[in-house]
Amino acid sequence: MRTLALALLVVGSTALFAQTPALPPIKLALVEGLSGGNANGGEAVFRNLVWAVERVNERGGVATPAGARKLALARYDNKGQTEEALSALRAAIDDDAQVILQGNSSSVAAALIDAINKHNERDAAKRVVFLNYSAVDPILTNEKCSPWHFRFDAHADMRMTALMDVLKDDKAVKSIYIIGQDYSFGHAVA
């Protein structure tokens, strides 16, 4: 009887001190141009995100109601093209990504907003959030405003307003010329 009691005590103690299994990571998906003309910008963003994810994970991850969760970052090359970005988004969602990261193209961001809105409406169990770190076309938070899209940068109208506020008081400035790109960002600042 003593042996049985001792064995139960050891087993019970071991169960008490056993670590609970780690919660699954929060999956981040970078959907960015990582090849072609946009490769340098996309790779720079990826390096910065790797650094940030490592820092968060070294500190124990992200606090959630269920407990701390680590971050896991995956990369998807959209080749700077909208259709490729939509394919990459589908692949990221199929891989159970919960957070989509993109920012180096406003036209890609606009397409992602539409696709994410449709996806989240159809599949509430696998909703994703879009974190936009640099696509600055005002349409993204005006006409295409979405509860699933969060922009961390000032949009082009805000930037131009700030620039004009400074320039109007600078008496040394006599003329200003804008050589803008022929796409949404260039049109927004013109």
Regions inferred by a protein language model and the residue ranges of each:
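Extracytoplasmic ligand/sensor domains, especially the bilobed periplasmic-binding protein
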Residues: 98-190
